[in-house]
Amino acid sequence: MKRERFKPPEPDDPLCCCGDIDQQREYCCCDCEELDDACERLLRGEPDKPDVFSRFISRMADRLGVSCCTVGPLRLELSVLPPMVLIPGLLRVAAINCLLGVIILTALPLLVLWYYYMTHRRKRRTLFFLSLALFSLAYMYYLFLTEIVPRGDVTHLQVVTATTGMMLTLISLVRTKQGPGFVKSQSLALGINSSLATNRSTNLTLDTDLRNGVSHLKGEKDVKKKCPVCQLVRPPRAGHCRICGACVLRMDHHCVWINSCVGQANHRQFILTLLLFLLTSFYGISLVLRSICPKQSLFTAMLYCPGVYNQYSTALCFTCVWYSVIITGGLLHLFILQIINVSCNVTEREAQIALRNKTGRRRFCGLVVETGDHSRGFLQNWIQFLTMNMDEIGSSLNLTDMV
C-alpha cells in the first residue's frame, strides 16, 4: 500500500512546527515532508540521508536568537560553548597523572583537526576555533594569576610584562578582525578606469606597482577576471572565499582561528597578531617552568621535572604548559609559512592553485612554493608587502564584527 504524502499544514494548525513558510523555506523550523520520510526510513531500518537531521539541527540553531536593544539581534552560536566546558575539564583530568596527561594531550589536537576538516569540507563558518583560542588564552592567564603568582617566584614586573603582552595580542586581534578588504562594485569601477589609464602609459614603474600591491612587467596589461559567484570583475590577486561568500582583495586564506579571511587590508596585522601571541606564549611558558621546576633548565624541565605530580596544583600547571606548547607549535608553523610566503611574494591561495595546476614547485621540504609570477626579490617583496594599498580596508569595527 502506497503511503499518502504529507499534506501542507493549514495556516491555523497549532500542531505544525513549521510556522510561516516562504518560497525558500527560510522561516521554517523543519521540512515536515522530509522529516516524515526520515522517520519512516528509520523505522524500516533503511539508511538515512546524511543531511536531513544536520539541516534540522542547523536550522534550529539558527533560529535561537538573543535580542539586544543596543546592538540588534544576535544569533546564539552553539559552537562557542564546547571549548568553555571541555578545556578546563580535560586539563584538570589530565593533571591527575602522567598517563592521563599523555592520552588527553594527544587526543585533543586530533579531535580539533577532525572538527576542522569536517567544517572545512562543509564550507561553513564556525566560532569554535576563535572561542577555543580566546578561552585558552584567558584560562592560561587565569591559572597564571591564581597558581603561579601566589608562589612568589614571579616579580611584579614579570606579571605586568605578561599582562601587557596578552592585551597587545587582543588589541591586534581586534584590528585584524576589522576586515580583509572586500571587492566592492563602486570602488571596483574606479579601479578599472584607473587601470585602463595606467595600461595606456608605457612608463609604468615598479614603485607604482608596489604601492598598489600589484607586481607586473613594464607596460603589461592587468588581467581582470569575472567572479562566477559574485558576478564582479575582480582585480588581480583577488579571490572568492566560499566561506565568507565574497571576493577578497589579495586573498591569502580563510583563517578559522580568527573566523575571517586574511587579505590585503589585514594581512600585516594578522602576522603581527601571530608574532605578539608567540612572544607572549614563550614568555609565559618560561615563567611557569621556572616556578614549578626551578632546578631544571627550560628545555629539560619540559621533559623531566621531578616531583611535579606530587601536588595537584603543580601538575595542573605542568599540564597547561604542554597544552600551551602544542598550541604555540601550531601557530609557530603558521607564522613561519606566512614569513616565507611574504618573502616569495606569494599568497597561500596562489600557492595552492599553482600546486593544483602543477605550475609551481616545492622547495625546502615543501615549506616554499615557487610560482614565479610576482616575486621581485626578497627586499622588494617585503617593501611591497609593507607598503601595499589599504584603500579597501574594512569599516570601523562594531560588536557584531568580532564574531
Swiss-Prot record:
Domain DHHC residues, every copy: 225-275
Chemical reaction(s) catalysed: L-cysteinyl-[protein] + hexadecanoyl-CoA = S-hexadecanoyl-L-cysteinyl-[protein] + CoA
Gene Ontology CC: one annotated term: Golgi membrane
Membrane topology: Multi-pass membrane protein
Catalytic center residues: C255 (s-palmitoyl cysteine intermediate)
Stretches of the chain found on the membrane's Cytoplasmic side: 1-70, 114-125, 175-268, 341-403
Record topological domains on the Lumenal side: 92, 147-153, 290-319
Superkingdom field: Eukaryota
Database matches in InterPro entries: Palmitoyltrfase_DHHC (IPR001594), PFA4/ZDH16/20/ERF2-like (IPR039859)
GO molecular function: protein-cysteine S-palmitoyltransferase activity
UniProt KW keywords: Acyltransferase, Golgi apparatus, Lipoprotein, Membrane, Palmitate, Transferase, Transmembrane, Transmembrane helix
Membrane-spanning segments: 71-91, 93-113, 126-146, 154-174, 269-289, 320-340
Primary enzyme class: transferase
Localization per Swiss-Prot or TrEMBL: Golgi apparatus membrane; Golgi apparatus, trans-Golgi network membrane
EC number: 2.3.1.225
Function: Palmitoyltransferase that could catalyze the addition of palmitate onto various protein substrates and be involved in a variety of cellular processes.
Family, as annotated: Belongs to the DHHC palmitoyltransferase family.
Free-text comment about domains: The DHHC domain is required for palmitoyltransferase activity.
Name recorded for this polypeptide: Palmitoyltransferase ZDHHC23-A
